[in-house]
A protein has these predicted regions:
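Hydrophobic alpha-helical transmembrane segments
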Residues: 1-59, 181
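Long, hydrophobic alpha-helical segments
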Residues: 22, 57-77
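Non-transmembrane, extracytosolic/lumenal segments of membrane-associated proteins
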Residues: 47, 107-222
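Transmembrane helix boundary and interhelical loop/hinge segments in multi-pass membrane proteins
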Residues: 73-86, 92
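Short helix-to-coil transition segments within interhelical loops
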Residues: 90-95, 340
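Extended, hydrophilic extramembrane loops/domains of integral membrane proteins
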Residues: 243-272
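A juxtamembrane structural motif centered on a specific transmembrane helix
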Residues: 244-248, 356-370
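Transmembrane alpha-helical segments that form the functional core of multipass membrane systems
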Residues: 273-364
Length: 370
């Protein structure tokens, strides 16, 4: 059985690696052509176009790896079936359950690889991509209104709420165009801070540069009090908004790991803000690696098709169609779940569960009737 396992694993891994390399080459070419349009801008060179396309590769690999696993495994299984090698293995004692177990173990390895890439490699490279593009464009603007964060605190003076607005980030990751508004429990405006830029420390303290600090009177007779205004070169603003929360608000979702997505969704819930989108993204990121296991089981069914049922090219084409349908279903269900307010984990698990049922049904039917 060790010989059978070694032969199957070597054949499947080499096929998956070839398909993944083909996908990455195609995606690199597309991204590189897209980056070439920027040549001619001040400071933008050909090597920058290559670097920009290279930074996109880990994210593309993460998204395409389950499809590469499906197509590569289908190709390997169909080739073994066409050459009657799989029939010989079945005659030698390779039962359907044992074959499913062997490929399930390999699928778990691919799932672990997908999880590691998505959790550790992709967030880092996506952040570098954002900073790289920000350096070329002079900073990254966060839409027309910027990114908004909320914070609530309870002190000796009562409950305070803060609304923080960040206009963008520069190439060094520094926050640009910061506005902080303070309100009391009754919604009265107490203070405002406008800073040119700032950074968030490890202790969640914001260090603001060129800050304009304005406070409004809190007395019973505001007409007798005066508004105070200070201009400070540096201002330290204590906060509970950590660097991770701020990064999640100002950077794209692709730059966040599953842990960061969960923490930010919890922060949004604590602040009574909409967290459905980030919870769905968290569950999709947590469950997406399992697609490799599901699609590996689906590919095993092609080994039980008779060689005369179609050539390898036809089976590979079927695998490509199945992979495209999985990606489309995964995206469509995510958008529908967000619009309809479905349970986040159910939205993320629905495509993989559906394909798992499909693969088991097809596998059982082929084993019994073919």
């Amino acid at each position: 059985m060790k010989t059978v396992r070694r032969m199957l694993y070597r054949d499947v891994v080499s096929s998956v690696a070839f398909v993944a390399l083909a996908f990455l080459s195609l995606s690199f070419f597309i991204d590189f052509v897209d980056e070439l349009q920027k040549i001619g801008r001040p400071g933008f060179t050909l090597w920058m176009a290559v670097a920009g396309a290279m930074l996109e590769l880990p994210g593309n690999l993460y998204e395409l790896l389950p499809i590469a696993v499906l197509i590569g495994t289908i190709y390997s299984m169909a080739r073994l079936a066409q050459s009657s090698e799989f029939t010989i293995l079945r005659t030698g004692g390779l039962s359907p359950l044992r074959a499913l177990r062997l490929l399930a173990l390999l699928g778990m390895v691919f799932s672990a690889l997908t999880f590691a890439i998505g959790e550790y490699v992709v967030p880092f490279t996506e952040r570098q991509t954002v900073l790289f593009k920000a350096a070329l464009s002079g900073g990254r603007k966060l839409g027309s209104t910027g990114a908004w964060l909320k914070e609530r605190r309870v002190s000796d003076q009562g409950e305070r709420s803060y609304s923080v607005n960040v206009a963008g980030i520069d190439s060094r990751g520094t926050l640009v165009g910061i506005r902080i508004f303070e309100f009391d429990a009754e919604g009265r405006h107490l203070s405002r801070i406008i800073a040119r830029q700032g950074r968030v420390g490890a202790d969640s303290t914001w260090t603001l540069t060129d800050a304009d600090f304005t406070t409004w009177p809190m007395g019973s007779d505001p007409s007798r009090d005066t508004v105070t205004r200070q201009t400070l070169p540096t201002l330290r603003w204590p906060s509970t908004l950590s660097a991770g929360v701020v990064s999640a608000a100002v950077l794209p979702l692709k730059t966040m790991s599953a842990v960061e997505l969960w923490r930010y969704s919890e922060h949004l819930s604590d602040q009574e803000q909409a967290s459905q989108r980030h919870r769905i993204q968290f569950w999709k990121k947590a469950l997406y690696p399992l697609a490799c296991l599901v699609l590996t089981a689906l590919a095993l069914s092609f080994a039980y098709l008779h060689a005369r049922a179609g050539g390898i090219s036809l089976k590979v084409f079927g695998g490509i169609m199945l992979g495209i349908s999985f990606v489309l279903l995964n995206n469509v269900v995510g958008h529908i779940g967000l619009l309809r307010g479905w349970t986040p984990w159910l939205v993320a698990a629905m495509p993989s569960t559906l394909f798992m049922l499909l693969s088991l049904a097809a596998f059982g039917w082929l084993v019994r009737y073919r």
